[in-house]
Amino acid sequence: MEKIVKFDLKYDELLKKIPYKYAIPVVVAKRAEAIREYARPFVITDDENYVSIAFMELSLNYIRIKNEEILKALIPKVK
């Protein structure tokens, strides 16, 4: 039997793993749209909100950001 995931979103902890604060909502929105349209969620949960499910998947490393090297180039170097 598969475990039902309970989840409390901590955006600050997510930013420690993925330091691109503007990329996170885009990735989550795209994944939520995919779940709504055709994809099955990677986590089993009672939550029916697609955005919450996508945040769970990102936080639990079921999905990741592609081309992270390109995003690293966009981080400003502050002196």
UniProtKB/Swiss-Prot annotation:
GO BP: DNA-templated transcription
Pfam hit, one: RNA_pol_Rpb6
Molecular function terms, GO-annotated: DNA binding; DNA-directed RNA polymerase activity
InterPro entries recorded: DNA-dir_RNA_pol_omega, Pol_omega/Rpo6/RPB6, RPB6/omega-like_sf
UniProt keyword annotation of Metal-binding present: no
EC number annotated for this UniProt entry: 2.7.7.6
Transmembrane segments: none
Catalytic activity reported: RNA(n) + a ribonucleoside 5'-triphosphate = RNA(n+1) + diphosphate
Family: Belongs to the RNA polymerase subunit omega family.
Role played: Promotes RNA polymerase assembly. Latches the N- and C-terminal regions of the beta' subunit thereby facilitating its interaction with the beta and alpha subunits.
Subunit structure as annotated in this protein's UniProt entry: The RNAP catalytic core consists of 2 alpha, 1 beta, 1 beta' and 1 omega subunit. When a sigma factor is associated with the core the holoenzyme is formed, which can initiate transcription.
Name this protein carries in UniProt: DNA-directed RNA polymerase subunit omega
Organism of provenance: Thermotoga maritima (strain ATCC 43589 / DSM 3109 / JCM 10099 / NBRC 100826 / MSB8)
